[in-house]
């Protein structure tokens, strides 16, 4: 089992990164804005990552749209999830969700990037870090728009990752800088926040799920990403999820209360994560690679599935009529946001 997804520092690989990529625990790389200058540079970086890894590995990015879009120049400007329904009826919003996801996925795949960590399934509530990254505060609207978005991703050949299970929208604190605590009752969480995940799992729409670094104090005292209650009892057993569980970044402040990076990695895997993100802290990531002991799990085949649906486009995107049509729709929408 190769469970660790890491980051790289810049536009090109340094000597340490070339060595790290060949480590037997490395499953993938997540890219950030700092890794992008232009499309040709990005393609060269991805090619080098794959070459030095030796084994096939995942390359991912957060490319939701709106304020969370890592690559901008020469990529289509993508709308935030929340903007889709603000000025449109549901039929139009679903068409835009599909188009946005298809364009996002096709442009990333054209650069040999496997997937974006999307969509956000949190309900829009009091969370400043979520806000319009969420489709809506309505369960029905969230499920409908998310399903259209996922269909767009899959039509282009990309898998989906629903986040942040079981819901990050009802806490004010940002788990990047604090440990949010959601003190609502189990009943409220299960009748509201968890519903988009539950419904999309029933539909077989989700390939992967990313849990939050939030404590739901009336349910369990561990953050969800380190909680066997949330990942095993609820997600796997109660909701019947068969896909891949990917931790949020273990370097986030919301994960620091579990211990050092090795303890975080061990706890996340023990709780039920199949893949773990260790970003923006090289020494912490190296300590995981040097010391983590893992065993193969039943999810190893599912982890491989994250890259099995990737397509390569025969036509260049600027000559692909589907891309041209969808891009034009998004350009019209961009005038509204």
From Swiss-Prot:
Coiled coil: none annotated. SUPFAM superfamilies: (Trans)glycosidases. It catalyses: Hydrolysis of terminal non-reducing N-acetyl-D-hexosamine residues in N-acetyl-beta-D-hexosaminides. One of its GO terms (cellular component) is cytoplasm. HAMAP family: NagZ (MF_00364). Plays a role in peptidoglycan recycling by cleaving the terminal beta-1,4-linked N-acetylglucosamine (GlcNAc) from peptide-linked peptidoglycan fragments, giving rise to free GlcNAc, anhydro-N-acetylmuramic acid and anhydro-N-acetylmuramic acid-linked peptides. This is Beta-hexosaminidase. It comes from Psychromonas ingrahamii (strain DSM 17664 / CCUG 51855 / 37). The gene is nagZ.
């Amino acid at each position: 089992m190769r469970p660790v997804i890491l980051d790289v520092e810049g536009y090109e690989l340094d000597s340490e990164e070339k060595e790290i990529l060949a480590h037997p625990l490395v499953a993938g790389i997540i890219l950030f804005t700092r890794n992008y200058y232009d499309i040709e540079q990005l393609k060269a970086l991805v090619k080098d990552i794959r070459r030095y890894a030796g084994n096939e590995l995942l390359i991912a990015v957060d490319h939701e749209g709106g304020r969370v879009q890592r690559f901008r120049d020469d990529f289509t400007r993508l709308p935030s999830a929340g903007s889709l329904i603000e000025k449109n009826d549901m039929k139009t919003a679903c068409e835009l969700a599909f188009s946005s996801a298809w364009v996002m996925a096709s442009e990333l795949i054209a650069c040999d990037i496997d997937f974006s960590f999307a969509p956000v399934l949190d309900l829009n509530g009091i969370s400043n870090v979520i806000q319009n990254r969420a489709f809506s505060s309505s369960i029905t609207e969230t499920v409908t728009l998310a399903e259209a978005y996922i269909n767009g991703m899959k039509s282009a050949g990309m898998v989906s990752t629903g986040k942040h299970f079981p819901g990050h929208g009802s806490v004010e604190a940002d788990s990047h800088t604090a440990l949010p605590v959601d003190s609502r009752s189990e009943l409220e969480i299960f009748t509201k926040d968890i519903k988009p995940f539950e419904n999309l799992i029933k539909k077989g729409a989700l390939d992967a799920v990313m849990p939050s670094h939030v404590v739901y104090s009336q349910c369990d005292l561990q953050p969800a990403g380190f909680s066997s209650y949330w990942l095993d009892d609820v997600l796997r057993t109660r909701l019947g999820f068969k896909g891949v569980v990917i931790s949020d970044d273990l370097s986030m402040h919301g994960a620091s209360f579990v211990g050092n990076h090795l303890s975080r990695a061990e706890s996340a895997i023990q709780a039920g994560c199949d893949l773990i993100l260790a970003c923006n802290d090289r020494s912490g990531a190296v300590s995981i690679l040097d010391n983590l002991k893992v065993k193969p799990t039943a999810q190893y085949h599912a982890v491989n599935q994250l890259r099995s649906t990737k397509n390569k486009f025969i036509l260049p995107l600027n000559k692909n009529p589907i891309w041209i049509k969808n891009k034009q729709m998004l350009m019209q929408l961009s005038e509204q946001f």
